[in-house]
């Protein structure tokens, strides 16, 4: 939904917790903080080593020039950082520095940093102002929007977390220029997901421009599909903030994906790669139930545009299924899947047998 506040922005309508996703330079962050009523003072900047090399220094300089005193914490990159130990590093550093409830937490990085720093903000002093500064495509179109924050547990992914909305999101399109191609194409998996579950027009745009979009060669088209994808996420979240109903459709592909990430070991697949594989499995199940309404070959062609570097077939299905049984979305011991009724319409079901899931996994792993 277009924001009433800016031409290149998306508004997330959550009553008193509403905020805007700005598609603008990180140089605008000091003024954006002022716009939402965050007066210059102390702020805690959380980022990772990869992102820090490119964006930490200029961001701190801009904040300092605007009167902010910045404490920065640079963490290792990768999914392993979404852990209790790294969370406590943030706690220890923040409390030793002497934060108060007016100290904003700035999450500069991809989905891992956003989830981790967001959960720290949600729990430190029972809540600090949170500002999401996503630098990866996956974070810009998905992880930074909607208020989900979490860390992983040995039992599964994102099992310890909270819903906690940011004060604002600033997604700088230029940060995608320094993103490794694998991370970029992985992020496109979430764009494709948003198109499949809610936006046939976005899916058609991806179909029509699949090669330049996946190759990151047309900035105008890429910017357009990103903004449309964020609009899908914002609309769904605005209608169901805490995933009590409709928001669950955003988990299309994620039941398989989260299990795959856990069983294969975090880092073997990027989150986007796992989601792409999970969407192929979900597409198989959807077509099985709605063969006329869900054109499997057409939709699969776009999903397959996401390159997969590791072989999911090496993950034994019994291990995968056991991991799915521990998924946080399950209810009453039933594994819940998001399926497509048709392009642009999705629903949640627990009516998937183990045999059906096995066949879907075999399809997802096929060439």
From Swiss-Prot:
It catalyses: 7-phospho-2-dehydro-3-deoxy-D-arabino-heptonate = 3-dehydroquinate + phosphate. Pathway: Metabolic intermediate biosynthesis; chorismate biosynthesis; chorismate from D-erythrose 4-phosphate and phosphoenolpyruvate: step 2/7. Binds 1 divalent metal cation per subunit. Can use either Co(2+) or Zn(2+). One of its GO terms (cellular component) is cytoplasm. Its cofactor is Co(2+); Zn(2+); NAD(+). SUPFAM superfamilies: Dehydroquinate synthase-like. Keywords: Amino-acid biosynthesis, Aromatic amino acid biosynthesis, Cobalt, Cytoplasm, Lyase, Metal-binding, NAD, Nucleotide-binding, Zinc. It is an enzyme of class 4 (lyase). Disulfide bonds: none annotated. The keyword Protein biosynthesis does not apply. PANTHER family: 3-DEHYDROQUINATE SYNTHASE (PTHR43622), 3-DEHYDROQUINATE SYNTHASE, CHLOROPLASTIC (PTHR43622:SF7). Catalyzes the conversion of 3-deoxy-D-arabino-heptulosonate 7-phosphate (DAHP) to dehydroquinate (DHQ). Belongs to the sugar phosphate cyclases superfamily. Dehydroquinate synthase family. This is 3-dehydroquinate synthase. It comes from Salinibacter ruber (strain DSM 13855 / M31). The gene is aroB.
């Amino acid at each position: 939904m277009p924001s009433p506040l800016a031409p290149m922005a998306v508004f997330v309508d959550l009553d008193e917790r509403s905020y805007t996703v700005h598609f603008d330079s990180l140089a605008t962050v000091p003024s954006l903080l002022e716009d939402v009523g965050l007066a210059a003072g102390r702020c805690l900047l959380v980022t990772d080593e990869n992102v820090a090399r490119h964006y930490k220094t200029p961001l701190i300089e801009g904040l300092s020039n605007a009167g902010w005193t910045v404490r920065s914490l640079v963490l290792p990159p990768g999914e392993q950082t979404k852990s209790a130990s790294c969370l406590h590093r943030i706690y220890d550093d923040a409390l030793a520095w002497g934060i108060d409830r007016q100290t904003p937490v700035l999450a500069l990085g991809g989905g891992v940093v956003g989830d981790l720093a967001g959960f720290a903000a949600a729990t430190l002093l029972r809540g600090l102002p949170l500002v999401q500064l996503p630098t990866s495509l996956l974070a810009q179109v998905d992880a930074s929007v909607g208020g989900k924050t979490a860390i992983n547990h040995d039992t599964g992914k994102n099992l310890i977390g909270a819903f906690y909305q940011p004060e604002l999101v600033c997604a700088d399109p230029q940060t995608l220029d320094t993103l490794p191609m694998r991370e970029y194409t992985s992020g496109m998996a979430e764009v494709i997901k948003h198109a499949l579950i809610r936006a046939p027009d976005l899916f058609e745009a991806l179909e029509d421009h699949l090669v330049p979009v996946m190759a990151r060669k047309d900035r105008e088209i890429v910017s357009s599909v990103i903004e449309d994808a964020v609009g899908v996420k914002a609309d769904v979240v605005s209608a169901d903030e805490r995933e009590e109903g409709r928001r669950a459709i955003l988990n299309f592909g994620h039941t398989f994906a989260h299990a795959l990430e856990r069983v294969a070991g975090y880092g073997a697949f990027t989150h986007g790669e796992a989601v792409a594989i999970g969407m192929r499995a979900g597409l198989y199940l959807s077509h099985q139930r709605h063969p006329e309404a869900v054109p499997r070959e057409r939709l699969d062609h776009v999903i397959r545009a996401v390159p997969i570097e590791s072989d999911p077939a090496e993950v034994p299905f019994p291990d995968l299924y056991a991991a799915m049984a521990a998924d946080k979305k399950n209810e009453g011991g039933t594994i819940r899947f998001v399926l497509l009724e048709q392009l642009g319409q999705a629903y949640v079901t627990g009516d998937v047998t183990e045999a059906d899931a096995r066949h879907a996994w075999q399809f997802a792993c096929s060439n």
